[in-house]
C-alpha cells in the first residue's frame, strides 16, 4: 500500500474516509497481529507513509532514523514517512488533541487535571496539560502504583476539575463501559474522551447530564490526520479543513432517531428522511418482531409488557451502536433510561409531536387501544420524550414532505450545535 494505517485491531477505525477527504489519496487499513508481523512490515518498507495506532506507537520508534520533537518528548510515534527507505517518525496526536480540546472548551490552564489510563495516549495528554499550564496532573489506572492512582484513589480527589480519558474504555464493541462516576467530583468543569466510536460514551453522557463541555475524540482524529497528511504529501492544508471534514464525517456517522407517540408518523417520515439522506431505515418494532419471530401483540400476550421492554432494550443497544441510520423507535422506547442512552451514543434524537386527535388508536398497538388510554399515555410520556430529545418538531398532518423537511432541518441544526 502507499498510504494507510497499521495497528492490531482496526475494525473501529474511521481513518480511511478522513484521509481520502483530506488528501485525495487511497488509504488502506493493515492489521498486524503481533510485533513479529510489525517488524516484518517495517523491514519490507512497502509504503510511502503510514499512521500507527495502538499498540505499536512505541514499538515503531527504533525503526525511525528521525524523530520529531513531539515524538521524542511524548515517546510515541503515530506517523511514519518513508523517504527513499529512510523512516521518519512524527507525533501528530499532540497537535490534533490540543486543538480539539481548545475548540471544545476544555480549559487546562490552572486546573487540576485527571488523566484516565496509562497507555501511550496518556503521555500525549500529559504533555498537553503541562504545556497548557495545568496546576496539577494526576494519572489513574486500574492497578495504581509508581505515581499512578487507582480509580478509587482518584475518586477521593474532590478537587479534580478536568477529566481526560486516554484509555479505550467505552470504545466499540465495549459500548457502555465506563471507568469512573463523575458525580464524585463537584468541581468538575469539562471532560475530553479520546474515544470516538461511539460518539457519546457513557463518560461523556455523564458530563452532558451536568451541562459540562464534553468532547469526543473525533475532532482529535481528524486534526491529527490533517497534520499527518501534510507530512505524507508535503502539502500544507488549511486548519479550516479539519472543521469541514469533521462536519462531513459527523453528518455521515450520526444516526437520526425519531421518538414520539404511537401514530405520530415516525415510520412514514423516517422512511422519507432515509431516502433523502441516502441511508438505511430501521423500524425498531419491526426489528423486535423479527428477532422474536412473532408480532408485538403476541409478545405482549405471551411475555407481558416486561418481556417486550426487555426485547426493546436489546434492540436499542444493537442499533444504537451502529452508525449512519435513520431509526424509528416504538412509542415506549423512552420509558427506560438505558434505551435513551443507547440511542444517543451515536444519534440525534428528534421528538415528533402530533395533536392527540391525529394519533392512531388501536390496531397493532396494545397500549393505545382507546382515546382515554392514549390521553393518559401522552400525559405520562411527553416529559420523557422532551427529556430524551435533542430537537422537537411538530407533525401537522399535512404533506409528509413538510414533516420530512422539518425533521431533516432539526437533525442538521442539532449537529451544527455540537450535540455529538
Regions found by a protein language model. Give the residues of each.
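NTP-dependent small-molecule kinase module
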Residues: 243-251, 272, 276, 348, ...
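Adenosine-phosphate binding glycine-rich loop
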Residues: 31, 194-254, 396
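Phosphate/diphosphate ligand-binding glycine-rich loop within oxidoreductases
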Residues: 2-104, 198-200, 204-206, 210-213, ...
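A glycine- and Lys/Arg-enriched "phosphate-lid" helix/loop adjacent to the NTP-binding pocket
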Residues: 345-384
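NAD(P)-binding Rossmann-fold cofactor-contacting core
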Residues: 132-148, 285-287, 291-292
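Glycine-rich adenosine-cofactor-binding loop
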Residues: 7, 89-94, 101, 106, ...
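Rossmann-like adenosine-cofactor binding region
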Residues: 147-215, 333-339
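ATP-dependent small-molecule kinase phosphotransfer cores
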Residues: 286-344
Amino acid at each position: 500500500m502507499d498510504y494507510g494505517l497499521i495497528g492490531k485491531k482496526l475494525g473501529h477505525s474511521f481513518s480511511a474516509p478522513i484521509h481520502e477527504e483530506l488528501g485525495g489519496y487511497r488509504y488502506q487499513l493493515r492489521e498486524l497481529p503481533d510485533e513479529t508481523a510489525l517488524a516484518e512490515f517495517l523491514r519490507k518498507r512497502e509504503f510511502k507513509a503510514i499512521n500507527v495506532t495502538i499498540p505499536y506507537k512505541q514499538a515503531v520508534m527504533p525503526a525511525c532514523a528521525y524523530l520529531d520533537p513531539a515524538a521524542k518528548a511524548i515517546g510515541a510515534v503515530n506517523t511514519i514517512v518513508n523517504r527513499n527507505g529512510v523512516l521518519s517518525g512524527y507525533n501528530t496526536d499532540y497537535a490534533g488533541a490540543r486543538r480539539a480540546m481548545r475548540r471544545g472548551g476544555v480549559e487546562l490552564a490552572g486546573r487540576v487535571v485527571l488523566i484516565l489510563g496509562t497507555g501511550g495516549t496518556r503521555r500525549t495528554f500529559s504533555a498537553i496539560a503541562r504545556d497548557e499550564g495545568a496546576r496539577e496532573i494526576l494519572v489513574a489506572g486500574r492497578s495504581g502504583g509508581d505515581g499512578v492512582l487507582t480509580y478509587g484513589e482518584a475518586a477521593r480527589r474532590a478537587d479534580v476539575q478536568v477529566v481526560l480519558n486516554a484509555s479505550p474504555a467505552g470504545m466499540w464493541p465495549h459500548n457502555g463501559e465506563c471507568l469512573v462516576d463523575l458525580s464524585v467530583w463537584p468541581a468538575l468543569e469539562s471532560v475530553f474522551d479520546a474515544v470516538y466510536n461511539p460518539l457519546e460514551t457513557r463518560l461523556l453522557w455523564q458530563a452532558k447530564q451536568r451541562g459540562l463541555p464534553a468532547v469526543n475524540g473525533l475532532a482529535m482524529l481528524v486534526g491529527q490526520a490533517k497534520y499527518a497528511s501534510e507530512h505524507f504529501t508535503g502539502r500544507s492544508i488549511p486548519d479550516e479543513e479539519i472543521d469541514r471534514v469533521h462536519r462531513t464525517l459527523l453528518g455521515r456517522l450520526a444516526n437520526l432517531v425519531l421518538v414520539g407517540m404511537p401514530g405520530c408518523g415516525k415510520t412514514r417520515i423516517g422512511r422519507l428522511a432515509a431516502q433523502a439522506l441516502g441511508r438505511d431505515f430501521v423500524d425498531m418494532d419491526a426489528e423486535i418482531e423479527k428477532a422474536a419471530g412473532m408480532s408485538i401483540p403476541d409478545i405482549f400476550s405471551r411475555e407481558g409488557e416486561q418481556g417486550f421492554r426487555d426485547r426493546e432494550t436489546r434492540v436499542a443497544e444493537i442499533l444504537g451502536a451502529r452508525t449512519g441510520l435513520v431509526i424509528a423507535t416504538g412509542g415506549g422506547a423512552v420509558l427506560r433510561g438505558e434505551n435513551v442512552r443507547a440511542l444517543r451514543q451515536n444519534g440525534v434524537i428528534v421528538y415528533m409531536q402530533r395533536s392527540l386527535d391525529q394519533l392512531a388508536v388501536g390496531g397493532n398497538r396494545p397500549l393505545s387501544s382507546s382515546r382515554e388510554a392514549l390521553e393518559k399515555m401522552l400525559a405520562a410520556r411527553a416529559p420523557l420524550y422532551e427529556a430524551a430529545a435533542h430537537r422537537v418538531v411538530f407533525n401537522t398532518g399535512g404533506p409528509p414532505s413538510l414533516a420530512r423537511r422539518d425533521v431533516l432541518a432539526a437533525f442538521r441544526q442539532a449537529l451544527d450545535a455540537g450535540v455529538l
